């Protein structure tokens, strides 16, 4: 019985992106059978737990799993029929419950399977190893045991989550003994470490440090969240250096650990890119979108679920584009398609693109069966763009978006918000709450006491809404003197780290082709500074500080001058149209074409939830810096989810540094 890891390093040879490596490890390292020179495929059963099912489904298609010899996929907690003539692969978390269930499967008078190959998603404790070794009946039927060290869900070609959906509540809510928060951080750290293990990366671990850590300062648990998480990740990596074969012994990349307090505005502001607006304005479940399609029998429209992911080339091309740009490109695709296909011209007749309905597009499918897949995809995105643009008009989001961005960049203030709330009656209640929370985060002193209460009354906020606004202070690094206030109630105050009213400054050298595209998340600035070695050490300490030559010598791509460019970068240039009206140089095509990058990877992890805008800038900076920037988080947040979570937070008591054990 051996616990080992194999797998090619992420450096050397053909470049493979984060998601490709994840997929190949699951398919080739775990599922692919050893045929021993025989071409005959031996079918096996695959048994997983609820979490590893998510891991597998996020990276691999069912058809890919079947091609590797898996005939049946089962869940370990459910009752299963015996398959005594078949071998089984277990991909499970190393928990006592899972190990007990696995041993039960393989023992007794009638074991469920002929032989078991067990792959654990993360390191196994010594006690569980001993539990397995003690069961001699099960040991006879075990063909192999291995730690895969792959316990994360790939959400994007450059994004992953650790599946800690409640991390924001667990880390920022009041919990006097902090046991729940510590347990959450330990799980998150272990899963971050498995990402690095999968890619064979050993990082410089940098984190957002707590402010003013000295004996005279009172601090809160939440200020130490990145510090504690960094320490826990470091401990996991130290173990991997000793136990994983070919794991790097010197630093190969950079990891920046942050929490949600780094940017309170990003989860609230209306983002105007296609991806962000889909997750904000449409009723999506993760990447799943449900829409109605015309019935083939002529009856009522049928509901259809589709995934907006990297298998959809149109989605990959448009996701980071401004909604106006995305709409223009869809118009161009349709125009080009119709101009190249006579049958489509007949069906299109004299109708303008904007007048085409889903039914019209369905008629095209019947007229052009050879293009059915392309038309289905195109009609889907035409419908989505139309729905988004209609919602923008109905809810007055353009005016709201302009005010939000003016607030963020210091071009508007409290009086402008009061005027807007007094005169605008079509924006939704949720949008009003988001606007008020942005004001509270940017202009704390103008939101104290009576002024803040009047603004919330003007917006007609409910009691739960007021709680969400008040709880914004929990996401900021609150600094207080040792002497506590003797007042019974607290005023609504927020920590202020800025002397200017603007929460953002316009980025030098970047022009905005599209309106409402000024906003950018703080992560963009941090990653650029990190790549140049300009992050201030006192604010972002490093567990293993690099030598001065690291940034000047080894990362030449990031040191190259970057020319200013607009939102419509060459990535989205309109060229090389194929005969069917699609762009042949799509992002997906380039991503999978095996191109090489010279720069070392940058990992950014935001505990407490990440946003679509933060994922967008990771796509952008990967091209700009010539380094793969990978965003990780405990979960991805859409605005509505963030509002719900903020209503569930409570103010916590302050603690002394003496109470913190790292």
From Swiss-Prot:
The keyword Protein transport applies. InterPro entries: Sec-1-like_dom1, Sec-1-like_dom3a, Sec1-like, Sec1-like_dom2, Sec1-like_sf. The keyword Transport applies. It comes from the Eukaryota. Pfam families: Sec1 (PF00995). Keywords: Protein transport, Transport. GO terms for biological process: protein transport; vesicle-mediated transport. Belongs to the STXBP/unc-18/SEC1 family. Involved in the vesicle trafficking. Binds syntaxins. This is Protein transport Sec1b. The lineage of its organism: Eukaryota, Viridiplantae, Streptophyta, Embryophyta, Tracheophyta.
């Amino acid at each position: 019985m051996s616990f080992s890891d194999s797998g090619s390093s992420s450096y050397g040879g053909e470049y493979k992106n984060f998601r490709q490596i994840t997929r190949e490890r699951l398919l080739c390292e775990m599922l692919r059978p050893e045929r021993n020179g025989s071409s005959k495929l031996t079918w096996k059963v695959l048994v997983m737990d609820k979490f590893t099912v998510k891991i597998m489904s996020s990276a691999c298609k069912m058809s890919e799993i079947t091609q590797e010899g898996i005939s049946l996929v089962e869940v370990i907690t459910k009752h299963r029929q015996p398959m005594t003539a078949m071998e089984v692969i277990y991909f499970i978390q190393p928990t006592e419950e899972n190990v007990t269930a696995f041993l039960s499967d393989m023992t007794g008078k009638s074991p469920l399977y002929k032989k078991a190959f067990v792959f654990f998603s993360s390191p196994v404790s010594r006690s569980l190893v001993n539990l397995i070794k003690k069961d001699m009946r099960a040991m006879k039927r075990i063909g192999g045991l291995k730690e895969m060290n792959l316990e994360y869900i790939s959400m994007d070609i450059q994004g992953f989550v650790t599946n800690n959906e409640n991390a924001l509540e667990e880390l920022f809510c009041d919990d006097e003994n902090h046991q729940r928060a510590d347990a959450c951080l330990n799980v998150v750290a272990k899963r971050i470490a498995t990402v690095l293990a999968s890619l064979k990366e050993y990082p410089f671990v940098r984190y957002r440090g707590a402010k003013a850590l000295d004996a005279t300062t009172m601090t809160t648990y939440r200020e130490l969240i990145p510090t504690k998480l960094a320490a826990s990740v470091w401990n996991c990596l130290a173990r991997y250096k000793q136990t994983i074969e070919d794991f790097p012994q010197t630093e190969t990349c950079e990891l920046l650990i942050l929490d949600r307090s780094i940017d309170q505005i990003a989860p609230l502001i209306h983002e105007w890119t296609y991806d962000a607006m889909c997750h904000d304005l449409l009723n999506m479940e993760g990447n799943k979108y449900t829409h109605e399609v015309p019935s083939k029998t002529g009856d009522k429209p049928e509901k259809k679920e589709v995934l907006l992911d990297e298998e959809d080339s149109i989605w990959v091309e448009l996701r980071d584009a401004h909604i106006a740009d995305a709409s223009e490109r869809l118009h161009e695709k349709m125009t080009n398609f119709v101009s190249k296909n006579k049958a489509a011209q007949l069906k299109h007749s004299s109708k303008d693109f904007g007048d085409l309905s889903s039914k019209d597009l369905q008629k095209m499918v019947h007229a052009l069966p050879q293009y059915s897949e392309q038309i289905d995809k195109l009609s889907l995105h035409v419908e989505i763009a139309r729905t988004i643009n209609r919602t923008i008009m109905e809810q007055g989001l353009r005016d709201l978006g302009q005010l939000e961005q003016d607030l963020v960049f210091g071009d508007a203030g409290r009086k402008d918000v009061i005027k807007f709330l007094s005169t605008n009656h079509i924006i939704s209640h949720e949008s009003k709450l988001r606007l008020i929370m942005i004001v509270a985060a940017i202009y704390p002193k103008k939101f104290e006491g009576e002024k803040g209460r009047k603004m919330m009354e003007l917006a007609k906020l409910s009691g739960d809404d007021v709680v969400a606004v008040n709880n914004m202070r929990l996401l900021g690094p609150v600094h207080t003197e040792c002497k506590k206030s003797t007042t019974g109630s607290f005023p609504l105050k927020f920590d202020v780290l800025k002397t200017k009213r603007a929460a953002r400054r316009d980025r030098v050298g970047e022009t905005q082709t599209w309106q409402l595209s000024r906003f950018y998340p703080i992560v963009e600035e941090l990653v650029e500074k990190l790549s140049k070695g300009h992050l201030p050490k006192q604010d972002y300490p490093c567990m293993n500080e690099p030598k001065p030559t690291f940034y000047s010598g080894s990362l030449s791509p990031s040191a190259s001058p970057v020319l200013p460019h607009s939102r419509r970068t060459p990535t989205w240039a309109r060229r090389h149209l194929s005969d069917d009206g699609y762009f042949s140089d799509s992002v997906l095509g380039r991503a999978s074409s095996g191109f090489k990058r010279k720069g070392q990877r940058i990992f950014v992890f935001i505990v407490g939830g990440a946003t679509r805008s933060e994922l967008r800038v990771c796509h952008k900076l990967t091209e700009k810096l010539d380094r793969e920037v990978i965003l990780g988080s405990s979960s991805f947040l859409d605005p509505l989810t963030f509002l719900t979570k903020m209503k569930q937070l409570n103010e916590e008591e302050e603690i002394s540094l003496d109470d913190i054990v790292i």
